[in-house]
Amino acid sequence: MNTDAQALHNSKADIKLHLGKSTTNGLGAGADPSVGEAAANESRDDIKEALAGADMVFVTIGAGGGTGSGAGYVVAEIARELGILVVGVATKPFSFEGEKRRKNAEWAINKLGRAVDTLITIPNDRLLQTIDRRTPLLETFKIADDVLRQGVQGISELITEHGLINLDFADVKAIMSNAGSALMGIGRASGDNRAVQAAQQAIESPLIEVSIDGAKGVLFNVTGGYDMLWQEHIMRR
């Protein structure tokens, strides 16, 4: 979904939805969330049609701009009205993107959090702790986008991919329905003790802004190669 016709044209998505054709005349929202909000409201019927029949919807936004910030919560509200489980994933802008985008992001994340079952917030500034300082700017934004992708993929594959310890939609719904704020950690390791190292990395991930103490539920996705041994299990610390 986008207000920008050119961005939609360049998108590789199978299904594309042009929001607010009259509101923006095919242009973007100009970093104004109120324009994105108006565009989504103009296209409510189209959004309903696109979401009809879904059991679970991810509403992903790069908070701070116009379209995602303004339209995200509207899409989430429509999905909830249709009885769909809705998971929001929002990236906070880097601090170097400026005060306006920071304020837009705060507004957008607050609105989205009220409209979804579960909201995962990814603080882009904390990503800077994990990447080389010499990383080019465009590559930095790509890394931020990829973390968002990993969040969505990690949850969706619990349902779509058959695992050795299988979970289904009912399991995911039990954890994520009306859950509120959620945290996401990612860990990778190889060699000796890799399972424990990866789990520890996920728990101590810089993406986690607050303590996980008091969490009421956990979704844990472990992926390994064909050489993973049965002894490699996640041990209690």
Regions picked out by a protein language model, each given a short descriptive name:
Residues 1-237:
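Tubulin/FtsZ superfamily GTPase core signature
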